């Protein structure tokens, strides 16, 4: 795994305002804060590429019992949102499979701020050995972590140093690039719609990677981006989907939560890509495919290290090569010839022989943002991007 260690720096501070604006990142904005503790996780979602469970197999074979180890996961929305939180819970379930008997529970609909601080403290008081925060809970978590050095904490997209805290983020660009290739091959209008939630680094990075992937196979495409200022609002997302379809988009990818894009594309004879969940059974004729995030590799590694007394704080960032990105089944419109191209590029990303951000790359204002011979190193991608590449119709909103 590419495990990165960064201390607080000017680069990190510069993104602080953006993270604060989207502190409820990737959750359900309409959810009320709550503290519903659930001891029995939802069933795992099957995919074509399940995470390897070699550690779990060996633990089970050895008859080891992990019932004395307690993990509590803090979700910022519903575990059944069909998106971000469902993905985290799916990864948590895979962690459970790797450690027979492990005590795993989760708490839903916890907003950043005092509700999150209270939830972290409640988890500690309940005897948690490890607490996992699935959105930008860094500041809420740090206060509790500092006062409880014998409990370990993991939080998404954080960066501050603490001996008992780890941070993690996912290289969604690996999956987005390959989804973009398929989209570029499927579109007939050469117009692809791409509604997103908020204008922060991971969103822009994925949008750029998707566009670059589509341009590799179809240089004539344009990607129309809409920033919706929400992670989940079916009414707003319905309007966005219809507006994009009316502008000629016959393919839609998205980084927001509702399934309305599939419905609209099915009605219009187009195709939809999912965001980190398998919706292939919903409007199957319109389903094109979609990458999935799997944090279980990271979760399992952290539990192993804690049990062994070898926990290492810092930032972890993983993609295809690290097993953090996989794919849902492709839809019926995706041909074997398309898949052959995608699989070849996928293997090159895993091997490190292909660099999607190799320059020269220009933004959609005509500025060279990555020079010829330059790139964005994998270790620095977590904080990209504050630009949109050429071929994207749209602007990053001011924050």
Model regions and ranges:
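Bacterial N-terminal signal peptides that target proteins for export
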Residues: 2-13
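A residue-level marker of the well-folded mature domains of exported/periplasmic proteins
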Residues: 32-399
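Alpha-helical interaction segments
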Residues: 15-17, 74
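Alpha-helical transmembrane segments of polytopic integral membrane proteins
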Residues: 18-19, 189
């Amino acid at each position: 795994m590419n495990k990165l260690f960064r201390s607080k720096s000017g680069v990190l501070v510069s993104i602080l305002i953006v993270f604060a604006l989207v502190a409820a990142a990737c959750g359900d904005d309409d959810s009320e804060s709550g503290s519903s503790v659930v001891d029995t996780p939802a069933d795992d979602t099957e995919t074509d590429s399940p995470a390897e469970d070699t550690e779990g197999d060996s633990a089970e074979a050895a008859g080891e019992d992990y019932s004395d180890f307690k993990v509590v996961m803090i979700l910022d929305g519903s575990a059944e949102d069909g998106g971000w939180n469902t993905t985290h819970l799916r990864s948590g379930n895979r962690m459970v499979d790797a450690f027979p008997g492990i005590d795993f529970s989760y708490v839903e609909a916890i907003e950043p701020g005092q509700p999150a601080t209270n939830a972290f403290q409640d988890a500690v008081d309940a005897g948690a050995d490890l607490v996992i925060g699935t959105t930008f809970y860094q500041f809420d978590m740090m206060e509790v972590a500092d006062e409880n050095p014998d409990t370990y904490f993991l939080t998404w997209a954080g960066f501050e140093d603490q001996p008992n805290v780890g941070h993690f983020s996912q290289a969604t660009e690996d999956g987005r690039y390959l989804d973009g290739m398929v989209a570029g091959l499927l579109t007939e209008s050469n117009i692809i719609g791409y509604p997103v939630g908020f204008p922060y680094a991971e969103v822009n990075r994925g949008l750029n990677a998707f566009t670059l992937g589509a341009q590799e196979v179809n240089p004539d495409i344009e990607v129309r981006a809409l920033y919706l200022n929400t992670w989940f609002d079916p009414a707003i997302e319905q309007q966005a989907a219809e507006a994009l379809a009316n502008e000629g988009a016959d393919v839609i990818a998205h980084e927001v939560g509702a399934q309305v894009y599939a419905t609209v594309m099915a009605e219009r004879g187009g195709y939809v890509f999912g965001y980190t969940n398998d919706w292939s059974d919903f409007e199957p004729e319109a389903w094109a495919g979609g990458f999935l995030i799997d944090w279980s590799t990271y979760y399992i590694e952290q539990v192993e290290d804690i049990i062994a007394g070898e926990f290492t704080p810092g930032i972890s960032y993983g993609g295809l090569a690290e097993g953090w990105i996989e794919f849902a089944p492709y839809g019926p419109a995706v041909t074997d010839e398309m898949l052959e191209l995608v699989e070849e590029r996928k293997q090159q990303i895993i091997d490190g022989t292909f660099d999607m951000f190799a320059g020269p790359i220009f933004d959609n204002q005509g500025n060279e943002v990555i020079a010829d011979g330059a790139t964005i190193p994998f270790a620095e991608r977590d904080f990209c991007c504050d630009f949109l590449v050429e071929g994207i119709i749209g602007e990053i909103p001011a924050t």
